Amino acid sequence: DIQMIVGGNVKRLEDVKKYIYTGAKKAILDMSKDTNVEIVKEASERFGSDKIAVMLNKDYDFSKIKQLKYDGVSLIIADSCANECIGLGIKILAFNCNFTFNDMVEFGKQDKVYGISDNSFAGDFDFLNFKAQLKEEGVNTIVFESAMSFDQFKKNSDGMIPVVVQDYKTDKVLMVAYMNEEAFNLTIKTGKMTYFSRSRNEIWVKGVTSGYFQY
């Protein structure tokens, strides 16, 4: 159920239709191509502005950028030009802007920011920890949070809470384990089920050994 924003090889309105009708959240039109520029308004009127995104690069004529809002564009994917797109009332996705962490914090606090896409996020990048850092810096981002703090749970004699782990689709009970406060907080922060082993007297993450992580 991951929502996709899809673009590439758009030459006519029918290509936009194919992307949207196959389930894309938005179709991307490339503003460096005249054929895409010509169909922005018509695509927005036909499929809805919420379905249309455009990609700009630093060579774009920014004197024309305000027209995009009137043409019904709901998202700008700004290739190396995110800061030039701030303040237009259109959501912005920064793309390949070579931001430092401080740049990301500053950009993330701007109005209408949709997100940041960068090559540094590739591989085994720890997104959850990164988002937690952004949250601490005051950037509005979605992180895992618990409706209850650890001290609100009823604990056993060891000061731990028993955890019954179930498959979220079938409700099948997979295992029973225990969490101390550290394991509980790590579970919320990382999104990976983390427990306390009473026999080994240590924290452990389900899946580190077997590869079968629980989320």
Roles of regions detected by a PLM:
Residues K33, N57-Y60, N98-T100, S120-D124:
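Glycine-rich beta-alpha junction loops
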Residues V37-F47, M104-V143:
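C-terminal helical cap(s) of enzyme catalytic domains, especially alpha/beta-barrels
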Residues M4-V6, K11-G23, D61-D71, A82-I116:
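Catalytic cores of alpha/beta
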Residues K17-S80:
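Conserved anion-binding
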Residues G8, L29-S32, N119:
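Short beta->alpha connector loops at strand-helix junctions that form conserved
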Residues K135-Y215:
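Binding-site signature for planar aromatic cofactors or substrates
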Residues D1-I5, E38-K58, C81-N102, E137-I142:
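Alpha-helix-loop-beta-strand connector modules within alpha/beta enzyme cores
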